[in-house]
């Protein structure tokens, strides 16, 4: 961040880690957090696309809070998830209804995992499940009737 100096005033720059302590911010830069007399000149953030030169300290802290509330799987695949969600806030709002299948590489893996977690099928042996259950058909059904995002590190089941 740096201050916006008027003619003849010195420009002060300082690097802050998030979340930004407002009192420290005001002390280091000598301007109020609500003043708008500062601008963001550099940033290293996962959600950098959400931050602009005139983003306020309060907005930065709010974005940081939302990002930290995402699961580690969602943070790792944040860029991929933004292909489906409009922005960080939209992802944050839906974070508790997104189901993550971190060890799944295909929809067949998701079908297997869903079956293993279903109480009606839990008592069946794996051999029995393999023999009687068509995982490929179930995977196709899931894909046709659900919304999934396949990433390098797993599969996300998204709300409709």
Regions found by a protein language model. Give the residues of each.
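Structured domain cores in non-transmembrane regions
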Residues: 23-88
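Extracytoplasmic/secretory-pathway segments with low complexity and glycosylation-like composition
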Residues: 78-79, 83-119, 137, 159
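Charged/polar, solvent-exposed surface patches and flexible loops
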Residues: 27, 31, 65-68, 80, ...
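N-terminal ordered "arm"
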Residues: 1-35
């Amino acid at each position: 961040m740096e201050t916006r100096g008027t003619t003849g005033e010195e420009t002060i720059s300082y690097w802050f880690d998030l979340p930004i302590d407002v009192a420290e911010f005001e002390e280091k830069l000598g301007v109020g957090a609500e003043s708008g007399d500062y601008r963001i000149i550099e940033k290293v953030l996962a959600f950098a696309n959400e931050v602009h030169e005139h983003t306020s300290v309060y907005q930065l802290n709010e974005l940081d809070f939302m990002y930290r509330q995402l699961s580690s799987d969602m943070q790792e695949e944040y860029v991929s998830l933004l292909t489906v969600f409009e922005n960080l806030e939209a992802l944050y709002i839906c974070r508790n209804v997104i189901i993550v299948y971190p060890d799944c590489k295909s929809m067949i893996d998701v079908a297997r995992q869903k079956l293993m977690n279903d109480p009606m099928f839990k008592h069946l042996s794996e051999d029995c499940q393999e023999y009687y259950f068509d995982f490929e058909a179930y995977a196709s059904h899931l894909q046709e009737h659900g919304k999934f995002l396949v990433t390098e590190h797993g599969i996300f089941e998204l709300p409709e």
